[in-house]
Amino acid sequence: MLRMEPLNSTYPSAAASSSPLESHVPSNSSGNGNEYFYILVVMSFYGVFLIGIMLGYMKSKRREKKSSLLLLYKDEERLWGEAMKPLPMMSGLRSGQVPMMLNMLQESVAPALSCTLCSMEGDSVSSESSSPDVHLPIQEEGADDELEETSETPLNDSSEGSSENIHQNS
């Protein structure tokens, strides 16, 4: 085989090694250990950096959750406080007089309301039993009965296999 000689002849061509490619590759056996150590150091820095980011994110989420729960609690407390407020005091009335006045108002309004409902029911019942309303549905039913009789007659005559036609023919 042919061997290529390097252009720069600073290396002895045949004295140091048997092939020219092996002479250009550095042979540091201790360099491999340093490379692994360098990779380990860089990866550990990345790991510490990522763990710091994760912890900061988790801490901010925990704070956000606590603050939102606190805000939710305060909102609900405010709503319950508004709902549980006592009735506003009227001028010159004590709090014991207000419910008594409401009871009296209910007692006077309830009979009037029931009478109004009864009179409305009476009006609707009387309108249902009035003569024009009653005659109109009866007239419609009568018209429907006449239509059914006229429609049945041609069907029986035109149907050849009906039982009536068979009895009439025999």
Swiss-Prot record:
Annotated coiled-coil segments of the chain: none
Record's keyword annotation contains Secreted: no
Keywords: Glycoprotein, Ion channel, Ion transport, Membrane, Potassium, Potassium channel, Potassium transport, Transmembrane, Transmembrane helix, Transport, Voltage-gated channel
Presence of keyword Heme: no
Locations listed in the record: Membrane
Feature: compositional bias, Polar residues: 152-170
Annotated GO CC locations: apical plasma membrane; voltage-gated potassium channel complex
Subunit-level organization: Forms heterooligomers with KCNA3, inhibiting its activity by impairing localization to the cell membrane. The stoichiometry of KCNA3 and KCNE4 in the heterooligomers are 4:1, 4:2, 4:3 or 4:4 respectively. Increasing the number of KCNE4 subunits steadily slows the activation KCNA3 and decreases its abundance at the cell membrane. However, a single subunit of KCNE4 is sufficient for the cooperative enhancement of the inactivating function of the channel. Interacts with KCNQ1; impairs KCNQ1 localization in lipid rafts and inhibits voltage-gated potassium channel activity.
Function description: Ancillary protein that functions as a regulatory subunit of the voltage-gated potassium (Kv) channel complex composed of pore-forming and potassium-conducting alpha subunits and of regulatory beta subunits. KCNE4 beta subunit modulates the gating kinetics and enhances stability of the channel complex. Associates with KCNQ1/KVLTQ1 alpha subunit to inhibit potassium currents.
Name by which UniProt lists this protein: Potassium voltage-gated channel subfamily E member 4
Species this chain originates from: Mus musculus
